[in-house]
């Protein structure tokens, strides 16, 4: 399965893996799954770190390098992804989350999230 991790799950996987459920850790560690992170997550981290958000105080350069070194593939943002945001219902206003949902849908990936609002979207989303 192709798994796209949302921003918080990426931060937890890299910095505080105990915050992940056992089933989420199992999915991340399974050789049957391909792991992806979105450029949107890197962008979100950079922006929110610059705003001094305490839950985003991580060096995005190091996080990206660590993800790549640990087998994650980087998912760029395409115009197809941006246009897919327009088709989403107005469930949630966070532009980063909406872009992640659009990317997962457009790419046929399963989006893993801990956010109950994100999990309300139709499509390949799994709340963990």
Walk through the language-model features, giving the residues of each:
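Short, well-structured N-terminal submotif of metal-dependent ribonuclease cores
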Residues: 1-37, 51-65, 69, 107, ...
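Alpha-helix capping/helix-boundary segments
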Residues: 9, 41, 81, 100, ...
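Generic beta-structure capping elements
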Residues: 14, 40, 77-80
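Phosphate/NTP-binding elements of NTP-utilizing enzymes
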Residues: 45
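Active-site neighborhoods of divalent-metal-dependent phosphate/nucleic-acid chemistry enzymes
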Residues: 55-61, 68-114, 128
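Active-site regions of enzymes building and remodeling cell-envelope glycoconjugates
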Residues: 122-128
């Amino acid at each position: 399965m192709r798994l796209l991790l949302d921003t918080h799950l990426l931060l937890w996987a890299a910095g505080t893996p105990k915050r992940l459920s056992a089933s989420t850790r199992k999915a991340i560690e399974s050789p049957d799954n391909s792991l992806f992170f979105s450029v949107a997550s890197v962008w979100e981290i950079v922006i929110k770190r610059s705003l001094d958000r305490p839950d985003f105080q991580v060096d995005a350069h190091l996080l990206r390098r660590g993800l790549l070194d640990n087998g994650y593939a980087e998912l760029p943002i395409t115009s197809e992804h941006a246009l897919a945001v327009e088709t989403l219902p107005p469930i949630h206003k966070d532009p980063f989350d909406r872009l992640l949902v659009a990317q997962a849908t457009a790419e046929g990936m399963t989006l893993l999230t801990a956010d109950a609002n994100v999990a309300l979207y139709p499509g390949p989303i799994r709340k963990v």
